[in-house]
């Protein structure tokens, strides 16, 4: 008997385009999991990213902007910008509504910036998870 060469999605997972799932996962944290029928996991991801992002805003954390300079400064600024942008709609709404904090000295501001970055990095992990589920590499 010949085995099927392609990996089929489990019966509980609706067939969705992996690119659509990836885009929705970026735009709305946990949204890709909702599309795939994983509502519990999607809600947990949404709340985790939202709480982390909200704490960062409440601590008046500065969002990274792409700036050039020496190699380390450029790497930190662009990496932080990508991580902030990975928060999806939360980042876009905060920028569109005019949130802008200057990078200033202080522990709470520094922690706030780290919470904003952590929210984006957590959403990147969720995007990878949703991608793997939608392509059948993970149950």
Residues of each region from the PLM?
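Transmembrane helix recognition focused on a "late"/terminal membrane span
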Residues: 2-22, 45-139
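Membrane interfacial helix-start motif at the N-side
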Residues: 9-14, 24-44
